[in-house]
Amino acid sequence: ISVHRCLGVLRPLHSLRWGRARYARRVAFAVWVLVLYCQAPVLYFVTTSTRSSRIICHDTSARELFSHFVAYSSVMLSLLFAAPFAVILVCYVLMARRLLKPAYGTSGGLPRAKRKSVRTIAIVLTVFVLCFL
């Protein structure tokens, strides 16, 4: 979504070619497949115990698997948080720079719509960090 928005701001005519629904569906499907593939090993690390005929699922792995779980979690943090955040950050910084650049032949401050767009960019980045970290 961020890449699509970035292309729309930086290269509006170019983004029309990549903004088609079929292309978006393919990208979304590929992302979901990647996420499911990356998260499947969590099922291997899950531990359960039985207390009073109730099965309890623990949020940590067995002791002997814990070092592997830490390594797996670190890779997943990099792949599923840091990489998307870097892409989002670069896209939104490029968009903000373009929006903050004064239009040719104008003087004075930024139009209200551009200020609101830059504020929205800051909010999106903040929400991403708060929700996914």
Curated annotation (Swiss-Prot):
PROSITE patterns: G_PROTEIN_RECEP_F1_2 (PS50262). This is P2Y purinoceptor 2. Belongs to the G-protein coupled receptor 1 family. It comes from the Eukaryota. The gene is P2RY2. GO terms for cellular component: plasma membrane. The lineage of its organism: Eukaryota, Metazoa, Chordata, Craniata, Vertebrata. Receptor for ATP and UTP coupled to G-proteins that activate a phosphatidylinositol-calcium second messenger system. GO terms for molecular function: A1 adenosine receptor binding; G protein-coupled purinergic nucleotide receptor activity; G protein-coupled UTP receptor activity. It is a multi-pass membrane protein. Residues 1-26, 96-116 are cytoplasmic. One of its GO terms (biological process) is positive regulation of mucus secretion. It is found in: Cell membrane.
